[in-house]
Structures are given as structure tokens and as C-alpha cells.
Design a protein with these regions (language model features):
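Conserved alpha/beta catalytic core and glycan-binding cleft of carbohydrate-active enzymes
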Residues: 39-50
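Acidic/polar-rich alpha-helix caps and helix-coil junctions
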Residues: 1-27, 52-269
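Extended substrate-binding grooves/exosites of carbohydrate-active enzymes
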Residues: 29-40
């Protein structure tokens, strides 16, 4: 993301490197290590903005999907990603993505890793979209989606700015009450701030982690069809466990003992 972007508020500037690309390019790209592989759980959350086509499930979607995630059929690293059996990106290869997806957000396309090519990387810690999302969440909890209580924007107006920036084709949020609008804000945070180190902490503060983080992790199995198309089958690739105690970190034993046990350990530890 450009340092000169008017949306950037706080950014950590890194030097020229290719570590992000090395760690996250598809395994079939020379030098790539297939590190972060997004889940199908996340991909399914991106809204449709056109006709639903099961044979082409990544078309007509919220454009933030294409901007953030490499899907089967994407043009990436100068070629078309094909994860079907026997293809260059065959998912059966060692260290290939188990979910059928690769990270795209933050990466520079088509760096020649074998020649040591590098790019500037900046980590944006805080940006304007987060302010709008924080504002929308707080205003909704305080006054509901459509009462600005004398402030500049309503919760709905702030949320719509974020969505319009992504695509003017995204439909307006129609949630009419506080509870439904809360879910709309949470959805928008999941999409807009994907891979920016917010989702886990959001789930903790919303007390949703027990439900969400105990769901199976899903991916897709890609198969070639007659002609030049593919078929996609949702498959379970992993199980996760989140315990009630994981909402809190434990105090170290030494801290508890040094307090003469006046410091009580968090529940479950």
C-alpha cells in the first residue's frame, strides 16, 4: 500500500525484500513456499454482485476477493493457476495449498525470486477504513443504524463509505435494526480487514470465538471438466479447538506465587 495514500494513518515501513513473496507464492512458482493459504470459509463470505455461476464460483463476487486471494483460474505469477490433478499447481504436491487458495493481499505479482528481485513492503497498522468500521460499530451500539445523534455520520452511512470504496456495485446494507446491522458490520470487518490481524481479536471481543473457531476448516478440491473448465467440491481440511479459557491468557506461575496467591489465576489454567 502506498505511503502517500490519504487512507494511511499509521504504517510500519519495511525495506526492499522478497520475503513475503517467497513465503506465500504458490509452491509451483519457483522459490514459492505456499505459506498462508486462505480458507474456503472466508471465500464463501465474499458477496455475489451478479449472477451466481457454480462452474465459475469466483466471478461476479465482491472485488475484494480477487484483490486478496489467489483462486483457481487466477492469473498470478504470469500464468493461470490450475490446481487440478496433474496440472502445474496440483494440490497433491508436497506443501501445496490444502484449501485451494493462496494469499494475494500484500504481495507483489510476478517477482522473479530466482533472480533475487525485491519490492517495497509496508505494513499498514491503522487506516481510514478501520476508523469508519469502528465508528459504524460504536454508533450502531449506541444509537442504532440510522440515528447520528448530532454527529456527522450515521452507522449506516459510515459503513456504506467502506462498501462503496470497494465497489459501487455492492448492494446497500438493508438491515433495519441494531442486531441485524451489528452482523452487517461484523461481516464488513471480516472482508475489509482480512489478513490484517483483526479477525481473531474481533472474535474474542465479540465473544464469538467459541462458535466460529470450533467450526471445521474447509477448502475446495479442484477437478478438470470436459473442455477448459473446472469443478469444485467443498472438503474439510482441518479441525480447530478453541476452549473457553482461551479468551484469556494465563498468569505465569511465578507471578501467582510472588503475589502470595492474592493474584488469582484465570479460569481453566
Amino acid at each position: 500500500r502506498s505511503l502517500s495514500s490519504p487512507e494511511t494513518i499509521y504504517v510500519v515501513r519495511r525495506g526492499m525484500s522478497n520475503d513475503m513473496e517467497k513465503n506465500n507464492y504458490p509452491i509451483a512458482t519457483q522459490g514459492g513456499a505456499s505459506g498462508v493459504t486462505p480458507t474456503h470459509n472466508l471465500v464463501k463470505a465474499y458477496e455475489w454482485i451478479g449472477e451466481v455461476d457454480p462452474a465459475n464460483p469466483y466471478a461476479n463476487r465482491d472485488p475484494r476477493l480477487e484483490a486478496s486471494i489467489v483462486t483457481n483460474g487466477s492469473t498470478w505469477n504470469g500464468r493461470t493457476i490450475d490446481q487440478s490433478a496433474g496440472a502445474m499447481d496440483d494440490m497433491a504436491q508436497p506443501n501445496a495449498s490444502r484449501t485451494g487458495y493462496y494469499l494475494k493481499k500484500f504481495l507483489t505479482d510476478n517477482l522473479n525470486l530466482t533472480q533475487g528481485a525485491t519490492a517495497q513492503h509496508n505494513w499498514v497498522v491503522f487506516r481510514y477504513a478501520e476508523i469508519l468500521l469502528n465508528y459504524a460499530e460504536a454508533m450502531n451500539e449506541a444509537y442504532g443504524p440510522d440515528d447520528n445523534n448530532g454527529y456527522t455520520l450515521t452507522a449506516r452511512e459510515a459503513l456504506q463509505i467502506v462498501r462503496d470504496r470497494a465497489s459501487m456495485l455492492l448492494p446497500e446494507v438493508t438491515a433495519e435494526n441494531k442486531d441485524d446491522f451489528r452482523e452487517a458490520v461484523r461481516h464488513e470487518r471480516r472482508i475489509e480487514l482480512a489478513f490484517e490481524d483483526h479477525r481473531y481479536w474481533d472474535l474474542l471481543r465479540w465473544k464469538d470465538a467459541m462458535e466460529v473457531l470450533n467450526e471445521p476448516v474447509y477448502g475446495v478440491k479442484v477437478a478438470k471438466t470436459d473442455g477448459n473448465g473446472w469443478s469444485y467440491e467443498e472438503v474439510e481440511v482441518a479441525k480447530r479447538t478453541f476452549l473457553e479459557r482461551n479468551y484469556y491468557m494465563p498468569f505465569s506461575r511465578s507471578e501467582v506465587e510472588n503475589s502470595n496467591h492474592t493474584l488469582e489465576q484465570n479460569p481453566g489454567y
